Curated annotation (Swiss-Prot):
A Pfam match: OprB
SLH domain sequence ranges: 87-151
A molecular-function term among this protein's GO annotations: porin activity
Family that this chain belongs to: Belongs to the OprB family.
Segments forming a coiled coil: 158-196
GO annotation, biological process: carbohydrate transport
NCBIfam families referenced in this protein's UniProt entry, alphabetically: por_somb
InterPro entries, per database record: Carb-sel_porin_OprB (IPR007049), Cell_Envelope_Struct_Comp (IPR051465), OprB_sf (IPR038673), Por_som-like (IPR047684), SLH_dom (IPR001119)
Entries under PROSITE patterns matching the protein: SLH
Name recorded for this polypeptide: Uncharacterized protein alr4550
Residues making up the signal peptide according to the UniProt record: 1-28
């Protein structure tokens, strides 16, 4: 009995192999009608499953996952294993020798409906699963439909149309399955695209190291070489992908220089010679929240909402490229005067602003916009003569025009109210002068005042290597006490050479008159001119070094004060 069993086991593989060979030949025959027995159909199925069992024992790799997926696609849609196999539509694979494979290959070469390989060929020496074949067939169907839709149907022959129809009928089940899967994937993709954004917060930082000193007679003697710093860490949060909530932490120890007259008397609080990194000093590097703003689109308009630290130059077009950098940032001009028109320094704090575009058609003045904003310095204070509307405030209106892509213009009006607190006119809502002489800034400690300011600014780029910008502003300050009225003027022009010597470098020269008051004090009617030159050298995308010189004339509008020169070496790290 055991010998008989042993011999049966030895002979069985040969019998099975012969059976499989005969079965395959019978299936490949075109007119084959012989029915296979139950055992003949089950045996090939069992043999086909054996490699899968072996593969499961091997380590799972990416290639294995791909093969398993292909096998699953191949096994989908199969009928009963005991049914008759007489049609090519019931093969799990389509061989290169099959008529369907050769017909599709001919269509591919003729119409170029599959171009997935680098050389544009179809590589017809490899077997395909029925779903892979159906995918190629679907591509050819789409290509032929495209040719017909574009009135090039004469390129498609009747023979090719007949071949496509036969292939479509032969692989109708697979085509329907694939198209169903594609529709489902497209629906899921559309859903993901519509809801792909999630609330994210991005850190944007800037650190400034600066070595600076002031020279010139008494002013030079009263000041020493200093090493100052400022750090800003901005948390930018977006909820929709189109808005941004900015929460900025700042720390710094930089202060401005003490200007002296020829009698060695301090000229007084002013913004002359003040540098951008000296704005927002927190004493001994104490950390403060110096900006809390939210910006979002509202229909065609852009809305700016400031809870703290709002500035007009946050939302209004300044038109001073290469000199202005994110409101006293570390990659523009050295001085606050060269950075932006002083009119944007009137007021600041909390409030709201809108920027509404217009003239989007074929007008030469495009794109154009109208900007309005309101900022209150003491919006959080509920005390008398304080708050959002009863304290110091500044309301801005500005028309912005662009003539082509090379010229930008802006006309600005700012109305301000200044309480009897002795705050500076150009203080950005921080009570200390940012630009201008002390006479231009001083508001009465006894009486309130109002101001109406008018400004023009322009930026012109005749070429990518040259930028010219400038501004002029006039303020009519009306005090509510005797001799409190004054007129304040300021103007300036700058020339910048971007990419000078190297991509990312900037050579800039700016000259003009700091804000000064006319006819308010005898012997103090000189125009305080200022000239600045700097060269920003780009070390990398995140580091720049800027040496520069600032020449300040007639400090305090006083002819009895010698000129002063400020030398600075600024290093800026951005991340």
């Amino acid at each position: 009995m055991s010998n008989l069993l042993w011999k049966s086991l030895v002979v069985s593989p040969a019998v099975l192999g012969a059976t499989l060979l005969v079965s395959s030949a019978a299936i490949a025959a075109t007119n084959a009608t012989t029915e296979l027995s139950v055992t003949e159909t089950v045996v090939p199925t069992e043999l086909a499953q054996q490699p899968e069992i072996v593969a499961q024992a091997a380590p799972i790799t990416e290639d294995t996952k791909v093969i398993d997926q292909v096998n699953r696609y191949s096994n989908e849609g199969k009928g009963n294993a005991q049914s008759q196999v007489t049609s090519v539509s019931q093969f799990s694979d389509v061989q290169p020798t099959d008529w369907a494979f050769q017909a599709l290959q001919s269509l591919v070469e003729r119409y170029g409906c599959i171009a997935g390989y680098p050389n544009g060929t179809y590589r017809g020496n490899r077997a395909l699963t029925r779903y892979e074949f159906a995918a190629g067939l679907n591509a050819c169907l789409d290509r032929v439909n495209e040719l017909i839709a574009t009135a090039t149907a004469d390129l498609v022959t009747k023979q090719d149309l007949a071949t496509l129809q036969r292939l479509q009928e032969e692989f109708s089940a697979e085509l329907a399955t694939l198209r169903g899967r594609v529709d489902a994937l497209e629906a899921r993709t559309a859903e993901l695209e519509a809801n792909q954004f999630s609330t994210t917060t991005k850190l944007v930082g800037e650190a400034i190291f600066a070595v600076t000193d002031a020279f010139g007679e008494n002013t030079g003697d009263a000041n020493n070489t200093v090493f100052q710093n400022r750090v800003r860490l901005g948390l930018q949060t977006s909820f929709t992908g189109r808005d941004v909530l900015t929460t900025r932490l700042a720390a710094g120890n930089a202060t401005g220089f003490d200007f002296r007259d020829n009698n060695n008397n301090s000229i007084g609080a002013s913004g002359q010679g003040l540098q951008t990194f000296q704005v927002g000093s927190t004493g001994n590097n104490n950390v403060e929240i110096d900006r809390l703003t939210y910006e979002a689109p509202f229909g065609p308009a852009q809305v700016y909402l400031a809870a703290s630290g709002g500035r007009h130059s946050h939302y209004a077009a300044v038109n001073n490229p290469y000199f202005f950098d994110k409101t006293d940032g570390g990659n523009g001009a050295l001085s606050t005067f060269s950075s932006e028109n002083p009119i944007y320094r009137i007021g600041g704090g909390a409030g709201i602003a809108f920027n509404v575009p217009f003239g989007q058609g074929g007008s030469i003045l495009r794109p154009s916009s109208f900007t309005v904003g309101y900022l209150a310095s003491d919006a959080n204070n509920p005390g008398p003569n304080q708050g959002l509307f009863n304290g110091d405030y500044a309301a801005l209106g500005q028309l912005n025009f662009s003539v082509g892509d090379r010229l930008a213009l802006a006309a600005t009006y700012v109305h301000g109210y200044h309480g009897a607190s002795g705050s500076a006119l150009f203080d950005s809502g921080a009570n200390g002068a940012i630009v201008g002489t002390s006479l231009a800034n001083n508001n009465s400690f006894l009486n309130a005042s109002s101001s109406n300011s008018y400004g023009l600014s322009a930026a012109f780029r005749p070429s990518d290597k040259l930028s010219v910008s400038g501004f002029v502003s006039y303020s009519d300050v009306t005090g509510f006490g005797a001799n409190d009225d004054r007129e304040v003027w300021s103007y300036g022009i700058g020339v910048a050479l971007p990419d000078f010597g190297k991509r990312g470098n900037v050579l800039g020269i700016f000259a003009g008159a700091q804000p000064y008051a006319r006819g308010v004090q005898a012997g103090a009617n000189e125009v305080p001119y200022q000239v600045e030159g700097f060269y920003k050298y780009r070390v990398s995308d995140n580091i720049s070094i800027t040496p520069g010189v600032i020449w300040v004339t007639n400090p305090g509008q006083n002819s009895n004060a010698d000129d002063a020169i400020i030398g600075t070496l600024r290093t800026t790290f951005t991340f």
